[in-house]
């Protein structure tokens, strides 16, 4: 057998997990709404290119300039998508978690007020919705601090949860160094 793999490829394996949910429920469901609109790659945010990741535009390529169609896709989420889902969750009394990107939240106080009034849990989804894979550790740390500051200013407390989404090799270390989170959804 070769050396131990640093990744856990086994988990709990064939051992049966004895999980007991409240009221003998057989399944637990958590609904998460990602709020990223306005913090994606965009020349208006000082970026060199437009966003291309997770787009409805098949085969999207970065454009060195404004990509009006891409911007419109993201703007839909803040203008209409959030509100449609929010109304549904409120009507059905469904509690949710919002993964909120700091820059995006700062751009839409009305959405933030709705989140506060609904008493949704809000986990920080970073300062920007960008790929941190090749971002310097110092810059990623700065973005983490900006995200925590924005969250604290908007919601009155620092976030309990963290989710970068497109993390770097440094992300987990930075989350641990900060030490103020109860959970890390990138794990």
Residue ranges of each PLM-predicted region?
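Catalytic alpha-helical scaffold of carbohydrate-active enzymes acting on polysaccharides/glycoconjugates
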Residues: 2-187
């Amino acid at each position: 057998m070769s050396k131990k793999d640093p990744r856990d490829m086994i988990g709990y394996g064939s051992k049966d997990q004895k999980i007991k949910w409240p009221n003998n429920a057989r399944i637990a469901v958590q609904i998460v709404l990602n709020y990223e609109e306005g913090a994606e790659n965009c020349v208006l945010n000082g970026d060199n290119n437009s966003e291309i990741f997770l787009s409805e535009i098949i085969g999207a390529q970065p454009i060195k300039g404004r990509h009006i169609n891409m911007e419109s896709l993201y703007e839909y989420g803040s203008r209409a998508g959030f509100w449609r889902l929010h109304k549904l969750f409120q009507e059905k009394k469904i509690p949710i978690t919002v993964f909120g990107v700091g820059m995006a939240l700062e751009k839409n106080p009305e959405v933030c007020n709705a989140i506060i009034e609904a008493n949704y849990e809000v986990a920080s989804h970073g300062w920007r919705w960008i790929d941190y894979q090749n971002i310097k550790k110092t810059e990623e740390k700065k973005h983490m601090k900006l995200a925590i500051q924005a969250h604290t200013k908007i919601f009155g407390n620092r976030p309990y949860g963290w989710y970068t989404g497109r993390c770097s090799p440094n992300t987990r270390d930075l989350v641990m160094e900060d030490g103020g989170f109860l959970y890390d959804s990138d794990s």
